[in-house]
């Protein structure tokens, strides 16, 4: 009921489309611990495009590490009687550790009616996502490898160049 008439979708952090491997996983992905208020144009647009591409990359590369979450700020609003906090933005961090050399990418998306944009336009170094979230994503890696992976991003190593845009239906 917190989401009803709030203007926000129930955005899944781990997409339901990724949970088809198990009825239990599919059921679990609908718990509110996996759901956050997400602007409809973001959720049904470029965020969906990124979810689909992430699935493709996982198949193409054999395995990738994926971390997804909200970015909160001091000015966040809330919705509903339970005062569900509305994130200012969302992130996704990817690591393909099997490629030589390994590669990583961060994505940051404002939780607004920004429009479709491109995946390349939202791709940032992992360091930028760490600055926005306060999370050290690759802390277990040797510092030299961590610095190499987090300090820059090469969109051409991830994106095929077909624009990677999506206008919501």
Q: Residue locations for each model-derived region?
A:
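Domain-level detector of nuclease and nuclease-like folds
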Residues: 1-169
């Amino acid at each position: 009921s917190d989401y009803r008439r709030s203007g926000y979708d129930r955005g899944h952090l781990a997409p339901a489309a990724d949970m088809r491997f198990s009825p239990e996983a599919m059921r679990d992905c609908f718990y509110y611990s996996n759901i956050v208020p997400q602007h409809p144009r973001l959720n049904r647009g470029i965020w969906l495009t990124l979810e689909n591409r992430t699935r493709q990359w996982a198949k193409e590369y054999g395995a990738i590490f994926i971390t997804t979450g909200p970015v909160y700020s001091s000015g966040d609003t809330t919705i509903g009687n339970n005062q569900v906090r509305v994130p200012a933005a969302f992130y996704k961090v990817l690591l393909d550790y099997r490629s030589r050399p390994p590669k990583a990418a961060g994505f940051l998306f404002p939780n607004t009616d920004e429009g479709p944009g491109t995946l390349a336009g939202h791709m940032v170094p992992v360091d930028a996502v760490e600055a926005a979230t306060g999370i050290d994503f690759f802390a277990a890696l040797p510092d030299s490898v961590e610095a190499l992976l987090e300090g820059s991003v090469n969109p051409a190593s991830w994106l095929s160049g077909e624009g990677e845009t999506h206008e919501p239906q």
